[in-house]
């Protein structure tokens, strides 16, 4: 397996694969890499009338566990802050959820992901009231 030149490149490839997966599942991608201050949401998509804030984790090995394990409480807070900003600035009022997509990479060819599986965890975490 020829790994990509950086973890950022692996992340970009993983996000592109996750976006394609969501589109194939009928989601509409609204934003990629939405930033608010130092916080980022990888993908913002509509699943019917539900707005989904999606964190993508690409991994070269499944030894590290579930992608959900990589989304710490601190990372969840960052995503929630960015989501709140997005809702404020977009003026959208709708049902929302927070998903995590894991892209488990099985093979690479010339630093490109060539074989992978997707793990999609809907409602992976919630906003504490």
UniProtKB/Swiss-Prot annotation:
Superkingdom, taxonomy of origin: Bacteria
InterPro entries in the record: Restrct_endonuc-II-like, tRNA_endonuc-like_dom_sf, UPF0102_YraN-like
Disulfide bonds: none
UniProt-listed SUPFAM superfamilies: Restriction endonuclease-like
Molecular function per GO: nucleic acid binding
Family of the protein in this entry: Belongs to the UPF0102 family.
Protein name: UPF0102 protein Cag_1992
Organism, scientific name: Chlorobium chlorochromatii (strain CaD3)
């Amino acid at each position: 397996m020829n790994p990509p030149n950086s973890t950022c490149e692996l992340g970009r490839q993983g996000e592109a694969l996750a976006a394609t997966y969501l589109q194939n599942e009928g989601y509409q991608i609204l934003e990629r890499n939405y930033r608010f201050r130092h916080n980022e949401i990888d993908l913002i998509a509509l699943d019917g009338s539900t707005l989904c804030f999606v964190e993508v984790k690409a991994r070269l090995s499944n030894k590290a566990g579930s992608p959900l394990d990589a989304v710490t409480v601190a990372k969840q807070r960052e995503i929630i802050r960015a989501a709140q900003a997005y809702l404020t600035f977009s003026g959208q009022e709708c049902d929302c959820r927070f998903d995590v997509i894991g892209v488990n990479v099985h093979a690479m060819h010339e630093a490109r992901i060539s074989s992978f599986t997707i793990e999609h965890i809907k409602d992976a975490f919630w906003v504490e009231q």
